[in-house]
């Protein structure tokens, strides 16, 4: 679904991307869907999906700080793909204590 890339905050090419640019690039490559560039813009499109109804491809949003948001792509089975500021593009689990405590909501944008 996604190309492997290193992470650089604010990056927009495949040598490094932030979380929202990664999601934008994957959606363009995989689904030919044009998403907005920033997390603040991405969280306003599509519609919210209940936790139990989330499906592969839905966006998953987190509140990681007072004004900081993070976005990834849900893959199913409690797993999501995202660009981490410290580890690059990785798979993580929603039941990981950190992600569980910062989970905000899912959105379907397809």
What annotation goes with each model-predicted range?
Residues 67-76:
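Catalytic nucleophile-His microenvironment captured as a short glycine-rich beta-strand/loop
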Residues 54, 65-67:
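Short strand-connecting beta-turns/loops that link adjacent beta-strands
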Residues 41, 65, 102-104:
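Mature, Sec-exported extracytoplasmic domains of Gram-positive
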């Amino acid at each position: 679904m996604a190309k492997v890339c290193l992470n650089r905050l604010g990056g927009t090419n495949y040598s490094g991307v932030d979380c929202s640019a990664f999601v934008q690039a994957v959606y363009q490559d995989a689904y030919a869907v044009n998403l907005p560039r920033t997390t603040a813009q991405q969280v306003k499109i599509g519609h919210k999906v209940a936790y139990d109804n989330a499906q592969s491809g839905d966006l998953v949003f987190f509140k990681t700080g007072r004004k900081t948001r993070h976005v990834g792509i849900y893959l199913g089975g409690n797993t999501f793909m995202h660009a981490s500021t410290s580890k690059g593009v990785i798979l993580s689990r929603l039941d990981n204590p950190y992600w569980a405590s910062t989970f905000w909501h899912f959105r379907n944008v397809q």
